[in-house]
């Protein structure tokens, strides 16, 4: 537990493959706090959070990734964003109350949209249908379609303990995008997937990364990189709210203040409410007289 909110990356040096393991506690708790989501929604949001962590760890540049689920089910929209510093935020929007607890019954018929935005360069998107039974399988399909890289993902969430975790195994391409010794590499990949399939939820929520990786891969040559901390970062602030208010006509600001005595703005992500009274908005109101 003490080492949760951490993402570990590692190489299988004899198998031309890579892996990732993310274990989250307070960063997941912060995303669901104050929202009163149903259990099934919390579980899927925890899985999506871990999936986005795993995806951002694949970035080779400074930037961010947003993974959105959109569909015609009771949860019409769910989104998690994260950057190369593993700073995450997420939200779910429900069209109706639901006791559903699977991807298909929560989102319904829909799509997964993955948007990658480098700080320098053009953003690009990948879109796949949510045709698989689980979010993990949909992500593996995304890699198969968009990257042509064999990838397997495992996702776990315990809403009672407010813990979430995920693992990834991915075959490494060679320099020109193909794989050398394909049959051997595919065999190695399947072997690593079989080992990772033995992971149990009680292990991923109780063992620290080093112990868990040893349990899974003690017969493999594994090179573990420096772990990276994962944190919750909503990004809202009073200054950003004031910037939004500045786009409102001064006369309208004055009218709202006259009726309500303040302007209130609530962040969709963290549910923090910012209140601005006449004094704090004096500079905006003064424009109405000019």
Curated annotation (Swiss-Prot):
Posttranslational modification: Under oxidizing conditions two disulfide bonds are formed involving the reactive cysteines. Under reducing conditions zinc is bound to the reactive cysteines and the protein is inactive.
Family annotation (NCBIfam families): PRK00114.1
UniProt cross-references to InterPro entries, sorted A to Z: Heat_shock_Hsp33, Heat_shock_Hsp33_C, Heat_shock_Hsp33_N, Hsp33_helix_hairpin_bin_dom_sf
Single Gene Ontology MF annotation: unfolded protein binding
UniProt-recorded name of the protein: 33 kDa chaperonin
PANTHER family in alphabetical order: 33 KDA CHAPERONIN (PTHR30111:SF1)
GO cellular component, one term: cytoplasm
Compartments where found: Cytoplasm
Keywords attached to this entry: Chaperone, Cytoplasm, Disulfide bond, Redox-active center, Zinc
GO biological process: protein refolding
Function: Redox regulated molecular chaperone. Protects both thermally unfolding and oxidatively damaged proteins from irreversible aggregation. Plays an important role in the bacterial defense system toward oxidative stress.
Record gene name: hslO
Family: Belongs to the HSP33 family.
Superkingdom of origin organism: Bacteria
Cysteine disulfide partners in this protein: 234-236, 267-270
